[in-house]
C-alpha cells in the first residue's frame, strides 16, 4: 500500500513538472510582433530563399499564424520550431503563388460598392476605376434627403445576395467606418452579411456553399477583425445548417488586426488603402489589363508600408525601414480560402491530429 502511494505521488509530481515545463515553454513564444521580429525573424529569413522586401510582406501573416498555434509550436525544440515556422512561411508563399492571378478588378466583373453616407467618397471613386477596366459597377451611398440608412443597407445586401446566388465574378468594396462587429456606416453586423452570402450561394440544391467567385474588400477601421469574424461565422453557420462549404470568398482588409484605418481629411475623407489603389491602378500609366490579387498584396501593400515608417537609405538604396509612429501602420491583410488538402498540409506541418479544426481561410500577407 505504501509502495502504491509512493508510486502515485511520484507520477503526480512528474506530471506537474511536465505541465510546468510546457507552460514555461509556451510563455517563451513571442506574443507581440516586435518581439517576433527581434527574436525569430532573423533566423527565419536566413533560411528562406527570398528578398528582405518579400519577407517583410509575409512577416505579419507568419507572426499571426504562429501566434494562433503558439502552444503547439512552443512544445517543440528550438530547431524543430524554427523548421516548422519556415515550412509555414513556405506554405504562405505557395498560396500567394497559386492565388495571385485571381482578378479583383477586370473586364465583365461586377463591382458592388458601399460608401459612407456622411463624408465618404463619391460613387465615381469606384465607378471610374471599374469602368476603366471594363467592370460593371453598382454603388450604394445614402441620399440623406430620400433614403434611410436601413433602406440603403437592405439594397446593398440584396445586391450581394444576388451576386452570391448567380455565381458571376464579383468584387464588393466597402469604404467607410467599421468595427470588429459591423460595417458601422450602415449598421450591418458580420452575422447579417454572413447570412446574406450563405442564403444566396445556398440556393443551389444539393451543392455546397461556394463563394469562390466573390472578392470582398473592406477599407475601414478593424477590417481584418471584421473579416475574420465574417469568415468564422460563415463556417459556423454552414455547420449549423448542415450545408457543405466549398469555398469562402477572397477577403481583403485595408487594416490589420486591432488597427484603425487612416484617411486624408478634407471635404471628404479618403481612406489611405483605396487612395493607393486609385493611384497605382488608375492614375499611373500604363495600366495593366486587369488588377489581380498579386497586384494588391505586392504593390498596394508595399506602397502602404511607408505609413508610420521612414526608409533607411544607404547611397541610392533603401536598405530597411525605421518605425516612426506605430499607430499609423495599417499593414493590409489578404485572406484566401483553403481546400481540404491545404488544411491537411497545415496539420502535418503543425503536428496536429488529422481531425483538428482549422479555419478555412489564411492570411497570406
PLM features: residue spans?
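Bacterial N-terminal signal peptides that target proteins for export
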Residues: 2-12
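A domain-level signal for caspase-like cysteine endopeptidase catalytic cores
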Residues: 37-40, 47-220
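Cleaved targeting-peptide boundary
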Residues: 27-33
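Active-site-proximal C-terminal subdomain of hydrolase catalytic domains
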Residues: 214-350
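Non-Sec secretion/translocation targeting segments of pathogen effectors
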Residues: 24-27, 101-103, 110-112, 362-365
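Glycine-rich, flexible loop motifs
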Residues: 334, 350, 357-363
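Bacterial N-terminal signal peptides
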Residues: 11-23
Amino acid at each position: 500500500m505504501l509502495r502504491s502511494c509512493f508510486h502515485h505521488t511520484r507520477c503526480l509530481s512528474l506530471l506537474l513538472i511536465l505541465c510546468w515545463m510546457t507552460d514555461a515553454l509556451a510563455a517563451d513564444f513571442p506574443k507581440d510582433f516586435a518581439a517576433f521580429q527581434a527574436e525569430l525573424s532573423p533566423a527565419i529569413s536566413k533560411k528562406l530563399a527570398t528578398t528582405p522586401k518579400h519577407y517583410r510582406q509575409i512577416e505579419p501573416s507568419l507572426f499571426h499564424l504562429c501566434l494562433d498555434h503558439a502552444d503547439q509550436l512552443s512544445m517543440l525544440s528550438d530547431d524543430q520550431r524554427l523548421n516548422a515556422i519556415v515550412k509555414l512561411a513556405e506554405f504562405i508563399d505557395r498560396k500567394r503563388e497559386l492565388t495571385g492571378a485571381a482578378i479583383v478588378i477586370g473586364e465583365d466583373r461586377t463591382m458592388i460598392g458601399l460608401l459612407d453616407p456622411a463624408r465618404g467618397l463619391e460613387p465615381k471613386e469606384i465607378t471610374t476605376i471599374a469602368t476603366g477596366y471594363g467592370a460593371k459597377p453598382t454603388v450604394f451611398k445614402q441620399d440623406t434627403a430620400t433614403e434611410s440608412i436601413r433602406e440603403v443597407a437592405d439594397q446593398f445586401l440584396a445586391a450581394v445576395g444576388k451576386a452570391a446566388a448567380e455565381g458571376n465574378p464579383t468584387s464588393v468594396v466597402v469604404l467607410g467606418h467599421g468595427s470588429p462587429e459591423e460595417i458601422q456606416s450602415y449598421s450591418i453586423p458580420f452575422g447579417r452579411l454572413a447570412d446574406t452570402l450563405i442564403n444566396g450561394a445556398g440556393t443551389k440544391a444539393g451543392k455546397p456553399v461556394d463563394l469562390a467567385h466573390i472578392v470582398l474588400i473592406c477599407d475601414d477601421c478593424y477590417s481584418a477583425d471584421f473579416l475574420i469574424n465574417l469568415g468564422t461565422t460563415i463556417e459556423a453557420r454552414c455547420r449549423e445548417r448542415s450545408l457543405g462549404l466549398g469555398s469562402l470568398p477572397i477577403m481583403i482588409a485595408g487594416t490589420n488586426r486591432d488597427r484603425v484605418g487612416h484617411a486624408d481629411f478634407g471635404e471628404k475623407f479618403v481612406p489611405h488603402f483605396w487612395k493607393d489603389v486609385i493611384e497605382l491602378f488608375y492614375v499611373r500609366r500604363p495600366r495593366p489589363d486587369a488588377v489581380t490579387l498579386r497586384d494588391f498584396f505586392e504593390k498596394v501593400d508595399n506602397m502602404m508600408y511607408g505609413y508610420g515608417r521612414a526608409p533607411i537609405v544607404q547611397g541610392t538604396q533603401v536598405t530597411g525601414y525605421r518605425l516612426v509612429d506605430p499607430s499609423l501602420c495599417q499593414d493590409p491583410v489578404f485572406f484566401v480560402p483553403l481546400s481540404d488538402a491545404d488544411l491537411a498540409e497545415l496539420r502535418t506541418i503543425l503536428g496536429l491530429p488529422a481531425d483538428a479544426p482549422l479555419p478555412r481561410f489564411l492570411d497570406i500577407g
